[in-house]
């Protein structure tokens, strides 16, 4: 155990601060508290910008906004007990928005667990239903591995992106861990595993597109990183395009496919609806035949949550969205102008 944390470059708190810096985190939003003070000290020492708030929920909302605007991980840090519970609404919002947010919380020391210590609340159980990852990191030598896994989950490794939560007992934060016990690969970003589209499904999707006369493309959060691929696909398909709140600004409003008004008419008149990383929720009439009376559905997404909802797709492609859009454009461009007659 280190007696002077500020002099121990190998404390768990110092390792956490170093990891965040190596992952490109230049600012953290939060409200100071005793349970997390060791991390704050290390962050300040290394020059990370700390944005102080007056309510913990605001810290998570700000981290959420930062992630939305930059594409980076948003990080918030709060103390134990009410510090964490004040974040529940903001974390639920990040979960529904599928935004990468890391919330770091404090918790009581291991020797005092279940003895009635200050602000001892089951944070991980409270947050688990709305987080991709919710853990207490109790083993000092494994804390950085836990952070590595949590951040990968936040960015959608093996599932949807979304908020994650990690808490570290106060005694663990002050524990010194030798450099030889921290593998280098824990400190660098994981390569997010990519799903590739089934060629048979791509062929079926192309058949649907060639049959259609009035295709409509609707994007959501799952398509937000595919600007180039989506623009190319729209040019290839010659479809009408609708954005949603989740994908506003993805496509230039001057693009010939863009429809800013008469959106209801566009949905009502489509004979093929192509959803790109978009759930059929209340904003899209739940995919109801009353809204889309003549449409078949082609669903593209990299997570099941954006495929399995209120309307089954005639063709569903569960794969990386960029790769799927490029695959469709490639096949369609092989025989430009060809359409099945029906």
Where in this protein do the model-derived segments appear?
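N-terminal alpha/beta PP-like core and its mobile active-site loop of ThDP/TPP-dependent enzymes
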Residues: 2-340
């Amino acid at each position: 155990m280190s007696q002077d944390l500020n002099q121990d470059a190998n404390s768990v708190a110092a390792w956490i601060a170093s990891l965040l810096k190596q992952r490109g985190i230049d600012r953290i939003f939060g409200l100071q508290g005793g349970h997390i003070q060791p991390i704050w000290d290390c962050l300040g020492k290394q020059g990370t910008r700390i944005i102080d708030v007056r309510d913990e929920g605001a810290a998570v909302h700000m981290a959420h906004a930062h992630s939305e605007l930059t594409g980076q991980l948003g990080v918030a840090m709060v103390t134990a007990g009410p510090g964490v519970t004040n974040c529940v609404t903001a974390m639920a919002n990040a979960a529904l928005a599928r935004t990468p947010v890391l919330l770091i919380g404090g918790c009581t020391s291991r020797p005092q667990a279940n003895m009635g210590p200050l602000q001892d609340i089951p944070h991980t159980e409270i947050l688990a239903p709305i987080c991709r990852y919710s853990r207490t990191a109790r083993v000092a030598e494994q804390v950085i591995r836990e952070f590595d896994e949590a951040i990968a989950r936040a960015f959608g490794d093996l599932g949807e992106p979304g908020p994650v939560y990690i808490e570290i007992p106060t005694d663990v934060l002050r524990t010194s861990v030798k450099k030889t016990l921290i593998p280098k690969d824990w400190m660098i970003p994981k390569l997010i595993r990519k799903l590739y589209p089934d060629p048979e499904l791509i062929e079926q999707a192309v058949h649907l597109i060639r049959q259609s006369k009035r295709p409509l493309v609707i994007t959501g959060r799952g398509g937000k990183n595919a600007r180039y691929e989506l623009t190319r696909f729209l040019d290839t398909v010659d479809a009408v395009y609708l954005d949603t709140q989740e994908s506003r600004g993805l496509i230039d409003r001057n693009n010939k496919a863009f429809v800013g008004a008469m959106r209801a008419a566009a949905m009502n008149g489509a004979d093929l609806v192509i959803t790109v990383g978009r759930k059929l929720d209340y904003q899209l009439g739940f995919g109801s035949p009353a809204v889309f009376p003549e449409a078949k559905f082609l669903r593209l997404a990299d997570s099941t949550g954006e495929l399995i909802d209120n309307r089954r797709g005639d063709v569903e492609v569960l794969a990386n969205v960029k790769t799927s859009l490029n695959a469709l454009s490639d096949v369609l461009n092989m025989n430009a102008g060809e359409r099945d007659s029906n």
